[in-house]
Amino acid sequence: MKTQTVLFSFFLVLLLVATQTEGGILDALTGILGKRALRNQNFVDYAYDPSLSAADWRALETLLEDY
C-alpha cells in the first residue's frame, strides 16, 4: 500500500510539473510571436461561398432537412 501511495504521489507531481512547463512554453511563444500570430484568422473564409445561388441553397436545405 505504501508503494502505491508513493508511486501515485510521484506521478501526480510529475504530471503537475509537465503541465506547468507546457503552460510556460505556450506563454513564451505567445510573448515572442504575439497573440495575433497564434490565432487562426482564416476560419471565417469558408463560412460564406458567393458562388452558391438561391436554388443551390434550396437544394441543400431539402437534402439536409431530415438529417
Curated annotation (Swiss-Prot):
Residues 1-23 form the signal peptide. One of its GO terms (biological process) is regulation of defense response to virus. Residues 37-67 form a propeptide. GO terms for cellular component: extracellular region. Keywords: Amidation, Antimicrobial, Antiviral protein, Secreted, Signal. It is found in: Secreted. Expressed by the venom gland. The modification Leucine amide is found at residue 33. Shows a low ability to inhibit hepatitis C virus (HCV) infection in Huh7.5.1 cells. Antimicrobial peptide. Belongs to the non-disulfide-bridged peptide (NDBP) superfamily. Short antimicrobial peptide (group 4) family. This is Peptide Ctri9293.
